[in-house]
Structure formats: C-alpha cells, structure tokens
C-alpha cells in the first residue's frame, strides 16, 4: 500500500529512491482524494463492498487510477494484471475488479470523477 503516482505512473514509494523522484510530480492517495481525481473509484469501492479492513485500499485506488489514466476501458484481465502485487486478504478481488470496471464504464459514458462527490439520490 505504499503506492504513489510519480509523474502520472503508479510506483512503490518504498522501492523508489528519493533521487529518482527529483523534479517529478508526486501524488499520494490523499492528494488524489482531495483533488477528487478518485472520487468515483472511492464511491464504487464503497458501493460494491470492495473494501473490508481497508489496509490494501490506498494501493488499490492508486493502481486503479493509474490504469484508468492509461487505458479508458481495460478488460477484466487487464484490471487483474494491473492489481497484481497489491494484496487483499479480505475481499477475494472480484468486488475490486467489479468496482474498477464499473468506473471505466461510467467514465466512458461521460461521467467524471467529481460527479461522485455528490451524495447518491
């Protein structure tokens, strides 16, 4: 769960030397949340019970954000591949994959991440 966005790509902060981040844009899950960049992912995770203890959630959200930035409509296999290396002992991953797939569909339909800051009707 040590994932951050480094110049738009998800990287493990715990495996990245500070010199490698020199001059780069670094975004944490908190920064992505405050900017509403992942609001739709957070809502979808909540709606689909894609989190339980929450330990893996920051890494899953950063990974999903990076994936959907690179590829608007990834297949379920591509989602699973992107998530490899992020371990969840609680959910079995299907709800996480479902949530990411749902966000990809919503974004393809023209909804934005910020749309999900509003409470559901």
Functional labels for PLM-detected ranges:
Residues 1-121:
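Signature of N-terminal electron-transfer/Fe-S-associated modules in redox systems
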């Amino acid at each position: 769960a040590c994932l951050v966005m480094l110049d738009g790509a998800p990287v493990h902060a715990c495996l990245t030397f500070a010199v490698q981040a020199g001059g780069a844009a670094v975004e944490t899950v908190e920064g992505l949340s405050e900017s509403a960049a992942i609001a739709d992912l957070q809502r979808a995770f909540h709606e689909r019970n894609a989190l339980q203890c929450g330990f893996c959630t920051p890494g899953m959200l950063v990974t999903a954000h990076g994936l959907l930035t690179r590829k608007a409509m990834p297949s379920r296999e591509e989602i699973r591949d992107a998530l490899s290396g992020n371990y969840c002992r609680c959910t079995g991953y299907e709800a996480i994959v479902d949530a990411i797939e749902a966000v990809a569909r919503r974004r393809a339909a023209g909804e934005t991440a910020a749309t999900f800051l509003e409470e559901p009707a």
